[in-house]
Design a protein with these regions (language model features):
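Conserved redox-cofactor binding core of oxidoreductases
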Residues: 98-182, 187-190, 194, 238-241, ...
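An anion/pyrophosphate-binding glycine-rich loop and adjacent beta-alpha core
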Residues: 218, 224-341
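Residue-level detector of alpha-helix initiation sites
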Residues: 10, 14-15, 37, 197-199, ...
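Short beta-strand to alpha-helix junction loop
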Residues: 78-89, 123-141, 152, 205-213, ...
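N-terminal Rossmann-like FAD-binding beta1-loop-alpha1 element of flavoenzymes
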Residues: 8-32
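Flavin (primarily FAD) binding-site architecture
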Residues: 193-206
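Glycine-rich active-site loop/strand segments that organize a redox cofactor
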Residues: 52-84
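Glycine-rich FAD pyrophosphate-binding loop
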Residues: 25-47, 57
């Protein structure tokens, strides 16, 4: 059994995995494994944007940290929150200036910022309603130019073992759509597990097909401590389509731009549960409020309504969502759209 040697093995090719490869020393020999093709990942499905303090005249690190701790019910790792908040603005500018990400801009050329749940200030940098795809595709272009990085598509890491300071990987490669896969073997000094979420363990999910929690199992088998598995996020506004397992996400940014949540009677209800934050409470809170309202009304019917806004604004700000729900028979410039919480 021959093992091909690399310095670093990165499992997963979403934004986390690719950004890691781009920021490692160029002298390192890097192998990246993608379960399917590079753009089939949760990162490419992300719509809303990137939270960072880009407008220091109206925002601050302390406010962002406070919002994050409140949304995390103070269970956050404060050191990690500080790193995220304080390094965030520079990384957003790096995405824009170094990697070519085209964030939406204001008339003065600065990055346009929107509002999302749990945030007390506008701090979400975005590219219309397909921010993840914009970032992912630009990072892919960059990593494909690196001579020290090898990317293998259609590859599944079956087993990962460690002997002293070396990791050994058994990788199933080949056509995942019916071809003849083969086992290939690699070893590396370091491993980065960037395998994404666990959405596919649920009947209905907005996650990509590759999100099956592989990284958790791989890390556990190596002896890593696994924490907080009960903290699974359910997004309150997926398009309500119980005929399809793959649910389409309606970005939180739609509520950030003023959309209302309505119950089965087409009435707003968030004021009963969150009188201050209303529709812009954190996702887990909004989802819980919807469950309480379902108990109160006896109906699982919910709607999201932004139709009172200017139609041209809606079509320009949310072109992907607008066209997607139009295919489903709803014109969000004229009527509410059906939604329900989903992983």
């Amino acid at each position: 059994m021959k093992f091909k040697k690399f310095d670093v093995l990165i499992v997963g090719t979403g934004i986390s995995g690719i950004y890691s490869a781009l920021n490692l020393d160029s002298s390192l020999k890097i192998l990246m494994l993608s379960k399917r093709e590079l753009t089939l990942c949760n990162s490419a499905l992300a719509q809303g944007g990137v939270a960072a303090v880009m407008d220091k005249e109206h925002d601050s690190y302390d406010l962002h940290i406070k919002d994050t701790l409140i949304a995390g019910q103070y269970k956050n790792n404060l050191d990690n929150v500080r790193i995220l908040v304080e390094q965030g603005p520079a990384e957003v500018l790096k995405l824009q200036e170094k990697y070519g990400v085209e964030f939406d801009l204001k008339d003065d050329g600065s990055i346009a910022l929107t509002l999302e749940g749990g945030h007390s200030r506008r701090r979400i940098a975005h590219h219309k309603d397909s921010t993840g795809f914009e970032i992912e595709t630009n990072l892919i272009k960059q990593v494909q130019e690196l001579k020290n990085v090898t990317v293998i598509n259609n590859s599944v890491l079956c087993r990962l073992e460690r002997d002293n300071r070396v990791f050994f990987a058994d990788v199933l490669t080949g056509n995942c759509e019916g071809g003849t896969p083969e086992h290939e073997y690699y070893c590396a000094d370091s491993v980065i597990l960037a395998t994404g979420g666990i959405g596919r363990v649920y009947d209905f999910t907005t996650n990509s097909a590759i999100a099956t929690g592989d990284g958790i199992q791989l890390a556990y088998n190596l002896g890593a401590e696994i924490k907080n598995l009960s903290y699974v996020q359910f997004h309150p506004t997926a398009f309500a389509d119980k005929e399809n397992r793959e649910c389409f996400l309606i970005s939180e940014a739609v509520r950030g731009e003023g959309a209302y949540l309505l119950n089965c009677h087409k009435q707003r209800f968030m004021h009963k549960y969150e009188p201050e934050r209303l529709e812009l409470a954190p996702r887990d809170v909004v989802s819980k409020c919807m469950m309480e309202e379902q108990k109160a009304t006896g109906s699982d019917e919910f709607w999201l309504d932004i139709s009172y806004k200017d139609p041209e604004f809606i079509r320009n700000r949310f072109p992907m969502i607008y066209n997607k729900v139009l295919e489903k028979g709803y014109d969000m410039t004229k009527e509410p759209i059906p939604i329900y919480p989903c992983q």
